[in-house]
């Protein structure tokens, strides 16, 4: 397996404050690596180092096959970066912004205009291309900002809180665009304050807390690792609730909780085999259920277990 991003032991200090304390990250080529962490955990510092905007005090990294320290200029030619807030010039039009970036990347005038037109069409902005950015909605600005970050066809793209402040519809549009990029072989490192975003997009997730990676894996792995599954059963008849409660308590060894209005009975379980046992017991008792399932912990619950902080406390990445 080839890796577009590999970092080992990254350390960064700001005076007496250690922002990163031995961070290891790895992103296979063409994948999305989600980086989660509470405010001040070190997410943005990590991105700035991997984008050559900061030099680490210790550790090493390669990006797109180039050494971050010895080949920084080559790395810059292979990456794109989108920060938390749109960085395009509000006085220029969409076309002018993209052409300007193309020219800065040493494209010819003709090639820069062709690339701008291509990206405006791809991101659904062709009709707005001749308008000043200050007339764009927040979602349109973010889409243009994302387009701007790939003018140079980067191999690696850093997205630092790319959907901050967007409404759900605009956020979903950005998600679709990001997924499309990985289909072309682009590797994405995504920091986000939205756990749903990481759950939806990331192939693997690294959780950073106090400058250290405290967990890494697929979303479902993190969920299983950090909490029990929840057994959920809703009897078809309200009269069966007491008997189902008794059966669930006997199987799990704990008193289940019950939603009195909907009749949903829930209990934490360690062994998923209990679900099969419950099905047999209900069948023996002649009880039918409208709902019967095992639910993994949410990524929010996993995040709380790993960092001691709920996702709601997250804010601007640091």
Give the positions of each predicted feature.
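Generic beta-strand hydrophobic packing signal
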Residues: 8-10, 254-257, 290-292
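Structured loop/turn residues at secondary-structure junctions
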Residues: 66, 128, 138, 236, ...
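C-terminal coupling/interaction segments
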Residues: 270-318
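ABC-family P-loop ATPase nucleotide-binding domain
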Residues: 1-11, 309-318
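Preference for bulky hydrophobic residues occupying beta-strand positions
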Residues: 12, 25, 233-235, 267, ...
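ABC transporter nucleotide-binding domain
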Residues: 175-269
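ABC transporter nucleotide-binding domains
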Residues: 3-7, 12-209, 214-215
